[in-house]
A protein has these predicted regions:
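Alpha-helical scaffold repeats of the Armadillo/HEAT/TPR superfamily
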Residues: 53-54, 102-117, 339-347
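Long, hydrophobic, amphipathic alpha-helical segments used as structural scaffolds
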Residues: 95-99, 103, 120, 313, ...
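Long amphipathic alpha-helical scaffold regions
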Residues: 58-73, 329-358
Length: 476
């Protein structure tokens, strides 16, 4: 399928059903368009096109005669307006809080709101259309136009009203209401949640300076089982993953659309950063453990954590742990691996098969295909798939939008919301003091990300055994 952006939108409005939502797996045209429109149709252009379709045009004399002969039937102009409102409603539902970041979206919502409230034609049509309720006072699928508009205007009243919730200045503060709950979940990256007197006017304390990697990780973790560690790790990973918006994934690959403010750190960036931190946290912990026995025990614990992450369907942390264990600075520690029980060496070899990149990571893809519930995907591979599709297919063919490319991109992106559905993970309780220590350790991972430094630490732990003396004695 290909066409100009305007023709694709026109075809969508002609064919879309008012019962279709953007996440419908059987009819994905609406979702594909809303997810990918920024690639070929910037928001400002979509804004103008939607208003044009909503306003329509004055009918000519011949069309008036035809409309008079169709008395009692649905007015096609009213049907088009309903479809425009339905499309925008689904768009706002997809964007969520992101609608606050785009001035073009806010301008469209405000202008459409004004048109809806002043549209006498729709108001008259709504009065002639009945509303049916069931015994639970829920509207049926034949909800009247008036009810749809009432709900739609309710959405419009609330989206722009929250635009000033985010501070734009480093010294700008927004007090939390006394009645507000769950405030920490709404704190974005680049912001801090500080506790200070309600009447206080002073600046909160500055954040603590970042410290180096944890020393004695073996001592810190020896009081916890690998299952407890993996469960807490999984709970925090889900906490971050649930905040990732599917459009963050699109923008990570193709860039942000025109007119979209921000461009700062997203939850996806934090998730990817945590993947690298977890990987080097494992390598650093092993390379900083000087005692051979403790180092082997730490290696065994990390292997069991990786196995537990696989059981929890946390493939992102599973890959991070396995990449850490497969790092060159760790793999060369032959004395450490020799002290590992054969059972755990076998477990590691079985888990290592999932890392096989051959046939486009066929083993991993077959594994996750068998999961019948939500799981944490290996996001770097998902981003690689998107990049391959984006760079391997032209956006325009002969001046027309290659919408088949948009379908392929949307199909991969839709994995994110599908994986986020129906997942409720809570952190296990270990007692207040133990839980607080573990929470800080797993949520503030630190590690050495310089491979040269890690290799040097590894060499100091276990010098090469096959190498002869650096300066062999000369013959006499």
């Amino acid at each position: 399928m290909s066409g100009t952006p305007e023709k694709i939108l026109e075809y969508l409005l002609d064919t879309v059903s008012l019962e279709t939502n953007y996440c419908n797996p059987t009819d994905s045209f609406l979702g594909d368009f809303l997810r990918m429109h920024s690639i070929f149709m910037p928001t400002a252009q979509l804004h103008r096109a939607l208003l044009t379709h909503y306003r329509g045009r004055d009918p000519g004399p011949e069309e008036v005669v035809v409309q008079e002969g169709m008395a009692g039937r649905a007015d096609p102009s009213v049907a088009m307006k309903e479809k425009v409102l339905h499309l925008v409603t689904q768009w706002v539902s997809l964007l969520g809080a992101r609608a606050q970041e785009d001035p073009a979206v806010l301008a469209l919502l405000q202008e459409l709101r004004s048109l809806v409230l002043n549209d006498a034609e729709l108001g008259e049509h709504a009065e002639n259309d009945g509303v049916s309720y069931n015994t639970k006072h829920e509207t049926t699928r034949n909800t009247s136009v008036r009810e749809k508009l009432r709900n739609w205007v309710w959405i419009l009243d609330r989206v722009p009203g929250r635009c000033d919730r985010t501070g734009s200045s480093p010294r700008e503060r927004e007090p939390v209401r006394r009645s507000e709950r769950g405030s920490s979940a709404s704190v974005g990256h680049g912001h801090r949640l500080s506790v200070c007197p309600w009447e206080g006017t002073h600046d909160p304390c500055p954040p603590p300076a970042p410290q180096g990697p944890h020393l004695g990780l073996d001592t810190l973790l020896e009081g916890y089982s690998s299952k407890e560690l993996a469960n807490h790790l999984n709970a925090y990973d889900w906490e971050i993953f649930q905040r990732i918006h599917e459009l963050d994934v699109v923008e990570h690959v193709v860039g942000r659309g025109e007119g979209v403010s921000g461009g700062g750190r997203t939850h996806l960036d934090s998730y990817l950063t945590r993947f690298n931190l977890l990987q080097y946290w494992v390598v650093t912990g092993i390379c900083l453990c000087a005692h051979l026995g403790r180092r082997s025990a730490l290696l065994r614990k990390f292997i069991k954590m990786a196995a537990r992450c696989k059981e929890l369907r946390n493939m992102n942390s599973f890959f991070a742990l396995m990449f850490g264990l497969s790092n060159a600075a760790v793999r060369r520690l032959s004395l450490t691996w020799e002290r590992l029980p054969s059972k755990h060496r076998g477990i590691f070899q079985d888990l290592e098969r999932l890392l096989d990149p051959s046939r486009n990571h066929w083993v991993y893809r077959q594994t996750v295909r068998k999961f019948n519930s939500a799981y944490l995907p290996f996001l770097p591979l998902l981003l690689k798939d998107l990049t391959f599709i984006h760079e391997g297919n032209k956006t325009y063919l002969n001046g027309l939008v290659n919408f088949e490319k948009m379908r392929m991109l949307s199909r991969v992106v839709s994995v994110v919301p599908r994986c986020q559905c129906n997942q409720d993970v809570s952190e296990p309780s270990l007692g207040e003091r133990r839980e607080q220590t573990l929470r800080v350790s797993l949520r503030e991972l630190r590690g050495i990300d310089n491979q040269g430094t890690l290799n040097q630490l590894s060499l100091e732990l276990e010098p090469p055994r096959d190498r002869g003396p650096a300066n062999p004695p000369t013959a006499k």
